Amino acid sequence: MRALLARLLLCVLVVSDSKGLVSTIESRTSGDGADNFDVVSCNKNCTSGQNECPEGCFCGLLGQNKKGHCYKIIGNLSGEPPVVRR
């Protein structure tokens, strides 16, 4: 279930970013309330295969693009300890 949720989240980020719809923070909550997390922009662009994102952030890419944007996931996922903001 977590893997499916993560894939769905990444898909939403990629599609939203390609359409310019991602704001600074995107909140997501599962239907049963078990998962509650935010996707936060790290305010940095990135390149595939490089280590350009700040610590704790990942590079979100659209399709086969080599350029993307850095994001961080903050919050609770089922069965995992809470992620703490730094």
From Swiss-Prot:
Source domain of life: Eukaryota
GO molecular function: C-X-C chemokine binding
Signal peptide: 1-20
Localisation per UniProt entry: Secreted
GO-annotated biological processes: negative regulation of chemokine activity; negative regulation of protein homodimerization activity
Gene Ontology annotations for the cellular component aspect, listed alphabetically: extracellular region
Disulfide bond residue pairs: 42-57, 46-59, 53-70
Record bears the keyword Disulfide bond: yes
Protein keywords: Disulfide bond, Glycoprotein, Secreted, Signal
Chain positions carrying an annotated carbohydrate: 45, 76
Known partners and oligomeric status: Monomer.
Function comment: Salivary chemokine-binding protein which shows chemokine neutralizing activity and binds to host chemokines CXCL1, CXCL2, CXCL3, CXCL5, CXCL6 and CXCL8. Binds to CXCL8 with 1:1 stoichiometry. Disrupts CXCL8 homodimer formation, disrupts the glycosaminoglycan-binding site of CXCL8 and inhibits the interaction of CXCL8 with CXCR2.
Name the record gives this protein: Evasin-3
Organism: Rhipicephalus sanguineus
Lineage of origin: Eukaryota, Metazoa, Ecdysozoa, Arthropoda, Chelicerata
